[in-house]
């Protein structure tokens, strides 16, 4: 027979986080925000279809760099960097990350979560895990379709580029995790988190990366770009240009920095959720 102490014991953080994850994942997948962001993820697929059609109509339509016509694998690498890592992943991380707690406050449902005898930080951790899975499910079909549409252009081999494709998926996962963790902390700690996220994604990161110096190290994109040349063919003109005109951090440093941003961001977000008093506006 369970004792009264057993019945009143607080659930552990991990058990609570898993339960919150199960409840939140379905809500995120079927939310209006996910429908809009799924359409955003469909944009690269439409672009890839246009590129494939142009290549079928005439190879001369494909872009060139220094007189060298770009093949499908290089075009795919550029799309991963310019469309996914520099735009779609930060936007998804910003919209989902800042809303993990803010949506509960705006909907005045946060009280129902916090009056229960569960660790507050577990609510944030569970919602963050749901964000990661939801975002991965939104992006993965888009990336796979773009891969099959673009890579065969110019005689590219799907089998030969598959290891690089796995590296691209790893970069996307690192970006989803790190941006989400950063914006989860912003959403849990600060007011007007979406405004701050917009300034960071569309103002701070693009602006700082254009100038030499140490400020670019205070961006996530700087460490993500350190992984990009290693996912692209090393003998391609685009890879040479990336290495020549941009300062690339070592791969080990990039992985350590992205992992640190993820772990510290989730920890600080959970701590902020535990300590902050949320005032519901009437």
Question: Where in the sequence are the language-model features?
Answer:
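Helix-loop-helix units of permease transmembrane domains in multi-pass membrane transporters
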Residues: 21, 96-132
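Alpha-helical transmembrane segments and their helix-start/interface "positive-inside/aromatic belt" motifs
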Residues: 25-41, 131, 192-198
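Terminal transmembrane helical anchor/hairpin motif
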Residues: 3, 51-76, 189, 194-275
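Short cytosolic juxtamembrane segments of multi-pass membrane proteins
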Residues: 275-282
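Hydrophobic/aromatic residues in alpha-helical transmembrane segments
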Residues: 93-97, 110, 145, 179-182, ...
């Amino acid at each position: 027979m369970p004792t009264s102490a057993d019945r009143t014991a607080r659930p552990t953080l991990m058990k609570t986080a898993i339960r919150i994850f199960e409840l939140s994942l379905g809500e995120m997948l079927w939310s209006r925000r996910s429908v809009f962001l799924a359409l955003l993820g469909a944009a690269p697929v439409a672009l890839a279809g246009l590129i494939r059609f142009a290549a079928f109509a005439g190879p001369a339509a494909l872009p060139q760099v220094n007189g060298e016509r770009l093949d499908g694998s290089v075009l795919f690498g550029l799309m991963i960097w310019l469309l996914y890592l520099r735009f779609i992943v930060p936007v998804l991380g910003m919209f989902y990350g800042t809303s993990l707690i803010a949506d509960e406050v705006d909907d005045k449902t946060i009280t129902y979560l916090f009056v229960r005898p569960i660790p507050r930080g577990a609510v944030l951790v569970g919602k963050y895990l749901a964000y990661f899975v939801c975002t991965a499910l939104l992006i993965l079909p888009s990336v796979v379709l773009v891969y099959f549409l673009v890579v065969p252009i110019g005689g590219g081999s799907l089998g030969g580029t598959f290891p690089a494709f796995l590296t691209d998926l790893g970069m996307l996962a690192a970006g989803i995790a790190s941006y989400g963790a950063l914006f989860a902390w912003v959403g849990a700690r600060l007011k007007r988190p979406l405004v701050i996220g917009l300034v960071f994604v569309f103002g701070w990161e693009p602006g700082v990366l254009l100038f030499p110096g140490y400020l670019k190290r205070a961006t996530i994109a700087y460490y993500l770009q350190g992984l990009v040349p290693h996912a692209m063919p090393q003998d391609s003109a685009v890879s040479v240009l990336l290495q020549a005109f941009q300062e690339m951090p070592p791969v080990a440093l990039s992985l350590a920095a992205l992992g640190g941003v993820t772990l510290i961001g989730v920890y600080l977000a959970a701590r902020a959720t535990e300590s902050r008093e949320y005032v519901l506006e009437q």
